[in-house]
């Protein structure tokens, strides 16, 4: 069951490039909405168009997901009263610039999908080049889309693969084999939090830990903000599953070739973040030095 209010706004198909994702699973049962809020504030530079939070209580009714999302900045969309209503010890958050689909309330994330096997929450940073093809395939088999974003295509494919998979993480892996493009995903089921990165590692995704809570984040700066320790980056092509039993890793989708987005280091990421072991600020200084050496000017 999902608590959402949708407001129709004018469509805007301008292409932009950034999004930020953040997820938490607190094994001590503490509510995570406020933590996600502060994580999203730290990732606000990655998306200022819309934002959202979805949570689930692992000790409550299975499959119940509470979500709230709106246009605008994080501190404008969420009041203390909003956060107080989002009760749950597992959750995902998202800040968005549209890469595919219009700038509307419906296209805000996280997406929450109810299907025959239960409920999924999904936050996605990236862009699929084969989204139109995958969308048509789903529509021909009866899928009805509520948004125009490729993130919903991913969610539908995960749900479909789940019908023939033993676990949600297996379904994520099977869906990834069909996806072409860039994606860093956080998938929430009622008892699991899953992070996945495309085989080329185009956009960042990292893991953090604070006491008995585990985190996924687009950037390490958000982990610092909530007092979490950086554990490691999610490897390109890796699926990381967090459950009360621990962390499981599947690298069967890993590729020998990485193709990271250079603009993460040049422009997108916050200077105090580390991406794949490289300090963003240091990378910018180094790039400037090399540029000056290769193209000196008289000044």
Give the ranges of each region predicted by the language model.
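Conserved short alpha-helical segments that host acidic/polar catalytic motifs at enzyme active sites
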Residues: 1-236, 241-299
């Amino acid at each position: 069951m999902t608590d959402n209010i949708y407001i129709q706004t004018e469509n805007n198909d301008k292409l932009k490039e950034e999004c930020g994702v953040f997820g938490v699973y607190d094994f001590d049962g503490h509510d995570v909405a406020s933590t996600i809020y502060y994580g999203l504030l730290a990732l606000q530079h990655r998306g200022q168009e819309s934002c959202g939070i979805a949570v689930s209580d692992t000790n409550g009714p299975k499959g119940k997901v509470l979500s709230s999302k709106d246009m605008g900045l994080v501190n404008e969309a969420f009041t203390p009263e909003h956060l107080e209503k989002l009760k749950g010890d597992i959750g995902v958050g998202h800040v968005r610039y549209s890469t595919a689909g219009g700038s509307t309330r419906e296209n805000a994330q996280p997406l929450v999908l109810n299907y025959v096997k239960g409920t999924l929450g999904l936050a996605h940073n990236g862009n699929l080049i084969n989204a139109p093809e995958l969308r048509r395939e789903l529509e021909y088999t009866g899928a009805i889309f509520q948004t125009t974003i490729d993130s919903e295509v991913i969610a539908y494919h995960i749900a479909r693969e789940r019908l023939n998979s033993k676990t949600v993480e297996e379904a994520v892996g099977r869906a990834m084999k069909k996806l072409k493009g860039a994606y860093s995903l956080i998938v929430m089921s009622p008892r699991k939090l899953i992070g996945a990165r495309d085989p080329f590692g185009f956009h960042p995704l990292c893991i953090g830990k604070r006491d008995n809570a585990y985190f996924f984040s687009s950037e390490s700066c958000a982990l610092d903000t909530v007092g979490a320790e950086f554990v490691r980056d999610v490897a390109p092509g890796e699926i990381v599953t967090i459950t009360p039993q621990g962390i499981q890793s599947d690298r069967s989708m890993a590729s020998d070739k990485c193709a990271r987005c250079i603009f993460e280091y040049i422009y997108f990421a916050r200077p105090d973040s580390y991406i794949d072991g490289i300090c963003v600020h240091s990378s910018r200084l180094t790039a400037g030095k090399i540029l000056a050496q290769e193209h000196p000017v008289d000044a």
